């Protein structure tokens, strides 16, 4: 089963995207904060992570290391708000993240979620320390 984890404080957007994913047969897990979302990754394997750029408080390299430890091989799509500059989008792309600008087509997100061939289970032993360090 394809699962998407959405880490975003914008509840209206997450519910809208979540309903559209549900219509496509994709399970969705929602988190309001970055730390809550990372903790969800320890409990539930996912196929794709949709992360609001506003929820990120780590430098790009540390963010990439964290997701590589907690959810290796899982694509991370960063949602960049329309008002943010192109440099914000490029910053995430340089660290290997996919970036979508607002507004974005939910079907494009669904297509990204369907691409992975398998759901990767988290590595709880290595991930616990990474989560603790990121959520201090």
Per-segment meaning from a language model:
Residues 114-130:
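The C-terminal output helix
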Residues 62, 78-100, 107:
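Alpha4 helix (beta4-alpha4-beta5 surface) of REC/receiver domains from two-component response regulators
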Residues 32-48, 52:
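Acidic, metal-coordinating helix/loop segments flanking the phosphotransfer/catalytic sites
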Residues 11-29:
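Two-component/phosphorelay signaling modules centered on CheY-like receiver
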Residues 47, 51-70, 80-88:
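Conserved phosphotransfer microenvironments
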Residues 8:
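Conserved acidic carboxylate
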């Amino acid at each position: 089963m394809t699962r998407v984890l959405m880490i975003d404080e914008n509840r209206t957007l997450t519910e809208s995207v979540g309903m559209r994913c549900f219509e496509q047969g994709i399970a969705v897990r929602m988190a309001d904060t970055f730390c809550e979302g990372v903790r969800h990754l320890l409990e539930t394997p996912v196929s794709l992570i949709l992360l609001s750029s506003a929820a990120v408080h780590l430098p790009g390299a540390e963010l990439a290391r964290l997701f590589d430890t907690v959810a290796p091989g899982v694509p991370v799509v960063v949602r960049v708000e329309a008002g943010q500059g192109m440099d914000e989008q490029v910053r995430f792309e340089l660290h290997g993240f996919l970036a979508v600008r607002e507004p974005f087509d939910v079907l494009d997100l669904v297509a990204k979620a369907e691409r992975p061939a398998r759901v990767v289970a988290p590595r709880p032993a290595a991930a616990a320390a990474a989560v603790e360090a990121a959520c201090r």
